[in-house]
Amino acid sequence: MVKKNSFISVITQEEKEENSGSVEFQVFHFTSKIRRLTSHLELHKRDFLSQKGLRIILGKRQRLLTYLSKKNKVRYKKLTDQLNIREPKIS
């Protein structure tokens, strides 16, 4: 059985049902998957397929965040603050 994450939900249940395609919901969903995979990989360090899946999900989330930052900086900042997502390093 899958445990629910203990961090605060940014999106209410009604919003999840209505806006499952919104960028905020997708980032929230990817973040919960990332946290679940990270805790799994702490126990199973040699699970290379899960590591690859984690990298893929991280890339998808980063592309969505880049899109959101270009379209609406206020929503981007609010979402990253609520989900405790770090700003990407600019090289």
UniProtKB/Swiss-Prot annotation:
Query: Where does it primarily localize?
Result: plastid
Q: Which GO terms describe its biological process?
A: translation
GO CC annotation, single: chloroplast
UniProt xrefs under InterPro entries: Ribosomal_uS15, Ribosomal_uS15_bac-type, uS15_NS1_RNA-bd_sf
Compartments (UniProt record): Plastid, Chloroplast
Q: Which UniProt keywords apply?
A: Chloroplast, Plastid, Ribonucleoprotein, Ribosomal protein
Instruction: Output the Pfam families linked to this UniProt entry.
Output: Ribosomal_S15
- Coiled-coil positions: none
Q: Name one GO molecular function term.
A: structural constituent of ribosome
**UniProt KW Ribosomal protein keyword:** yes
Ligase among keywords: no
* UniProt superkingdom: Eukaryota
Q: How does it assemble?
A: Part of the 30S ribosomal subunit.
Q: What is this protein called?
A: Small ribosomal subunit protein uS15c
Tell me what gene encodes this.
rps15
